[in-house]
Swiss-Prot record:
Pathway entry: One-carbon metabolism; methanogenesis from CO(2); 5,10-methenyl-5,6,7,8-tetrahydromethanopterin from CO(2): step 1/3
Stimuli inducing this protein: By growth on tungsten or molybdenum under anaerobic conditions.
Keywords: Methanogenesis, Oxidoreductase, Repeat
Identification of the protein by name: Tungsten-containing formylmethanofuran dehydrogenase 2 subunit C
UniProt record similarity statement: Belongs to the FwdC/FmdC family.
Molecular functions (GO terms): formylmethanofuran dehydrogenase activity; transition metal ion binding
Catalytic activity: N-formylmethanofuran + 2 oxidized [2Fe-2S]-[ferredoxin] + H2O = methanofuran + 2 reduced [2Fe-2S]-[ferredoxin] + CO2 + H(+)
Biological source species: Methanothermobacter marburgensis (strain ATCC BAA-927 / DSM 2133 / JCM 14651 / NBRC 100331 / OCM 82 / Marburg) (Methanobacterium thermoautotrophicum)
Domain of life of the source: Archaea
Length: 270
């Protein structure tokens, strides 16, 4: 796989909008042509080379390209937006919308990600080794269809409303989450290995949420179905005992499932 290395020159006070940082756009271009790719700096159209040193070996196919961002890009948005193939490795933090609309390929962020990581994601893999802010795998503002495919893994903590309006795919949070994970969820799987503050699965109609830690405050719209051990979801087994709930029956005909680890959640057992 050919590697193209972007080294940040500086991170400006006004965020960069860079949806063109993806293998699909770099494919078939020389290094000089990649330097001339357009990005947004506020309301100005600028060149990628104005803010990044560019080096490496180009390739004709997106699937043969690995973009390495060698430094922190905490003020660069939309990296990998709607990418379909190839790889991106970010050796630092990223701003909002990393992997938004992603259809294929793989993005790895070695630092933290701001809000809307993997928004409206449809395929591929997004891995964040640090923390993620709010709306991981959520819908576009005003839409009622969120993430529908792919896998998002956050090794740290995540914020509010992860998987909002989720329609498919899988989100794994290895740390804790804030309020309303899986709000308006219709399908897919959310795995929370840490704790959740409150309102897990609020107004969910379908899909599955597994919480291995403690749910501090649970919603009243869920029907208790008993205890299940070594649960299996989509061919994957999760060992241990879990309280099983169906809901959220604030929504007519809701069939969403929330599993909460017995060892951490005796306070929500009916």
């Amino acid at each position: 796989m050919s590697e193209i290395i972007l080294t940040p020159k500086e991170q400006p006070e006004v965020p960069l909008e860079a949806p063109n940082i993806k293998p699909d756009v770099f494919a078939g271009k020389s290094i000089d042509e990649i330097k001339n790719i357009q990005i947004m700096y506020g309301n100005e159209v600028v060149k990628l080379g104005d803010f990044f040193e560019v080096s490496g070996e180009p390739a004709d196919a997106a699937s043969d390209i690995k973009i390495i961002i060698d430094g922190d890009v905490y003020n660069t948005k939309r990296i990998g937006q709607e990418m379909t193939a190839g790889e991106i490795l970010v050796k630092g933090n990223v701003n909002m919308y990393v992997g938004a609309g992603m259809k294929g390929g793989r993005i790895t962020v070695e630092g933290n990600a701001a809000s809307w990581a993997g928004q409206d994601m449809r395929g591929g893999e997004l891995e964040i080794l640090g923390n993620a802010a709010d709306y991981v795998g959520s819908s576009y503002r005003g839409d009622w269809r969120g993430m529908s495919g792919g896998v998002i893994t956050v090794h740290g903590n995540a914020g509010n409303e992860i998987g909002e309006y989720m329609n498919g795919g899988k989100i794994i949070i290895k740390g804790d989450v804030n309020i309303m994970p899986g709000i308006h969820m219709n399908n897919g799987l959310i795995i929370i290995e840490g704790n959740a503050v409150a309102r897990v699965g609020g107004e969910m109609a379908g899909g599955t949420i597994i919480v291995k830690g403690m749910i501090q405050e649970f919603l009243p719209g869920f029907k208790y179905l008993g205890v299940e051990k070594d649960i299996e979801v989509n061919g994957e087994t999760f060992p241990g005992a879990f309280y099983k709930f169906e809901g959220d029956h604030a929504i007519k005909g809701a069939k969403g499932i929330v599993y909460a680890a017995v060892g951490c959640n005796g306070h929500i057992e009916p």
